[in-house]
Amino acid sequence: MIRHAGAPARGDPTGPVPVVGKGEEEEEEDGMRLCLPANPKNCLPHRRGISILEKLIKTCPVWLQLSLGQAEVARILHRVVAGMFLVRRDSSSKQLVLCVHFPSLNESSAEVLEYTIKEEKSILYLEGSALVFEDIFRLIAFYCVSRDLLPFTLRLPQAILEASSFTDLETIANLGLGFWDSSLNPPQERGKPAEPPRDRAPGFPLVSSLRPTAHDANCACEIELSVGNDRLWFVNPIFIEDCSSALPTDQPPLGNCPARPLPPTSDATSPTSRWAPRRPPPPPPVLPLQPCSPAQPPVLPALAPAPACPLPTSPPVPAPHVTPHAPGPPDHPNQPPMMTCERLPCPTAGLGPLREEAMKPGAASSPLQQVPAPPLPAKKNLPTAPPRRRVSERVSLEDQSPGMAAEGDQLSLPPQGTSDGPEDTPRESTEQGQDTEVKASDPHSMPELPRTAKQPPVPPPRKKRISRQLASTLPAPLENAELCTQAMALETPTPGPPREGQSPASQAGTQHPPAQATAHSQSSPEFKGSLASLSDSLGVSVMATDQDSYSTSSTEEELEQFSSPSVKKKPSMILGKARHRLSFASFSSMFHAFLSNNRKLYKKVVELAQDKGSYFGSLVQDYKVYSLEMMARQTSSTEMLQEIRTMMTQLKSYLLQSTELKALVDPALHSEEELEAIVESALYKCVLKPLKEAINSCLHQIHSKDGSLQQLKENQLVILATTTTDLGVTTSVPEVPMMEKILQKFTSMHKAYSPEKKISILLKTCKLIYDSMALGNPGKPYGADDFLPVLMYVLARSNLTEMLLNVEYMMELMDPALQLGEGSYYLTTTYGALEHIKSYDKITVTRQLSVEVQDSIHRWERRRTLNKARASRSSVQDFICVSYLEPEQQARTLASRADTQAQALCAQCAEKFAVERPQAHRLFVLVDGRCFQLADDALPHCIKGYLLRSEPKRDFHFVYRPLDGGGGGGGGSPPCLVVREPNFL
């Protein structure tokens, strides 16, 4: 039987929210996603460093069967264990479909669940899910370790899981579809009976265990993010808080999954609890230094520790077409179906009296329930939660009593001390489940608990993510404000009122002052990253500030935006309206009115540069991707930086001549010189800032290979052991306090991304050095011959590696048209001092720049003059993203002139993709699902610009593929229309 699953849950948006990431508040210095993934472990086998993603990519001929029909997929999956999957393409809708084996207790009623994989521009996601992915491999890899809306995690065949080398994976991949009937997929695996899963969603029937039985002490799952695309959101399993399931209780824990004692369990449950393994609650927060309660109940020492790995919390979206075997209790007909086994909440630090009081009345099924379990060890800092497409996932808890809702919420309390847990963010909830969680932390509300102690337990709602917890900091719909007001009205005043910015758990278990907690919550990166995504989902403007998806704001700007005091809510609708008026968006709009005209235009240019809907915005994004690819293959630091500077100059020339900028500029307010300076500063922020770390890394690598850094370090030690007289110093040198100020200036200069800002800091540093020189003989003028030895003395006591990178960065990346004046003099002097240190010789000490250094400076000045002249008459080099065979597959960003024809671009594609028969390949454009072939003399850049400017916005992809098939319609599709002009639609 085949069932379709994955429809959107009630209250969820019917379609995906466009990828968010343009708010400067959410900047996390990801640059072009160059951050290396962390390496936490989970419980999936991982041998010799082969990640799940690599295994999926290598074995895609086995599980990615686009041409298979529904019946054939069902035939294959009915013979394998639960959790096995295949991906096919629906012949009618042309959409990918994830087919998962889903048997019940009765093998004859086994099903194949089908989840539609939606595609929107550059993202993929399961229908009904909030998580978006870059490609099918990352999507499948994520669902192999976390189920989200699936009833359980996906399972790879045992042969793939146990493969220890790429040779083994190639052997499996060569079998293709025949793998499922081969000896590598043994009969005992295909036919072994299903057993209850260790990790399933409430309301789903039991299926076979998805966790492999192989033991491995080095289990891991990494998904490495690739560079070279303009996507902003990715889901990485190693960044998911609930990324793995529990191991079977009869197996010892893996080497990197520490054994943790489980809370006491109860046998007085329904008959289904005999075979339904219970999910342990998350560990409690760390015990505070001074307990909130002086009397703690004794801890039973006879609890046997059992292995347990972190479990994903249950999603509130059940599969709509699967009939559960364990219906919900009759007195709660609106609840999601669940297993009736009772779940004992894990004791939380600081809530000892609360839990003890809750366990006294009611039908306690076991004596162990009256005594809390020993506290579990605190977990490490949890990684960042994955991005979400929608604001909130509504959970229908209105029919439940407050006591049971509080018990359900206690099951999902995160451990205290995590840097990104919900307790570190403002808790202004709009969900009913969160209202009852606030009540659970209030001792005065506990007399309500005994009335519901005997009712069947309620499955815990999915823990609300950061992006949903911040909903109340923005203008919210009226119904959300009413819910929030009701929650505050229900709360009973306590001697110590809860502080904003902390969850109830942290309010009871921590002793931090309110100011510290508020500052911590505002400075957390999740607060910054979630604000823009939440606002975009609500359709509300967060701020009228720079919307920079690539972390292009300064540190000072970020601190200013989050330094405003938090507004304390009161249980009244008036305060809900006040919160709307006093939101960040309103504050930002008010301050925006006081900005100067130049500053306003600067912010508009920055917004335009990262608006992918504009032609200039797409040009900037493609340029950054191209620059990263270019830097990876450069061997000369000067050539690398010069190419970056040339591209920036061309981008500026294009924007100054484009109609996009003319629509933003008032000619009466801005002169041509001011306009050029504003655009240059905006490009520093939109281009250089996200590329800064990559540039420094490439420069460091290049200079390490040519021996420059090693030579600098060796001579630095020699100069440190040399007296000031031997260095040629005839004046005073900076004292220790002044030297500390100078080194602080150097540190600030290294952190800056703008070449002009770096030069400004360098000038201030040189002034400090001159002031130190004049201390010994005030009033005496000193020249360059006196300054150079002292500068060498100062540089030898600084970080020479950073100084070398900074000087080269400033010399090659600043605007060729910029008249530096004094800045140019001190920059070249610093360069000369570094060259003197690099080639330092005690015998030939000189107080002047050597001839070689002077020649090098003259070459640099000529290069600047030539670049300035070339920029005035050069054509803008454009970029175009082309995929191979299928849209968004093996995408490459190609650089070419705007007047390049399709035939020349095809030659570039043939070289880039290394095709064997380039004459049989052509360039196609897919527009809203329709395929068109570009004529040889067509201009792809003109077509790209036309499609970007068209209204309504169109989804288009350039694809390089053979003429006889592939891409949009498959081999049997009719021939595509050949187009030449941009307005072919």
UniProtKB/Swiss-Prot annotation:
Keywords: Cytoplasm, Cytoplasmic vesicle, Endosome, GTPase activation, SH2 domain. Widely expressed. Residues 278-288, 315-336 have a biased composition (Pro residues). One of its GO terms (molecular function) is small GTPase binding. Residues 63-158 form the SH2 domain. PROSITE patterns: RA, SH2, VPS9. The keyword Cytoplasm applies. Belongs to the RIN (Ras interaction/interference) family. Ras effector protein that functions as a guanine nucleotide exchange (GEF) for RAB5B and RAB31, by exchanging bound GDP for free GTP. Required for normal RAB31 function. This is Ras and Rab interactor 3. It comes from Homo sapiens (Human). It is found in: Cytoplasm; Cytoplasmic vesicle; Early endosome. The keyword Iron does not apply. Residues 877-963 form the Ras-associating domain. Interacts with CD2AP, RAB5B, RAB31 and BIN1. It comes from the Eukaryota. One of its GO terms (cellular component) is cytoplasmic vesicle. Residues 703-846 form the VPS9 domain. Residues 189-201, 424-442 have a biased composition (Basic and acidic residues). Residues 587-732 are annotated as: Interaction with RAB5B. One of its GO terms (biological process) is signal transduction. InterPro entries: RA_dom, RIN3_SH2, SH2, SH2_dom_sf, VPS9, Vps9-like, VPS9_dom_sf. Gene3D superfamilies: SH2 domain (3.30.505.10), VPS9 domain (1.20.1050.80).
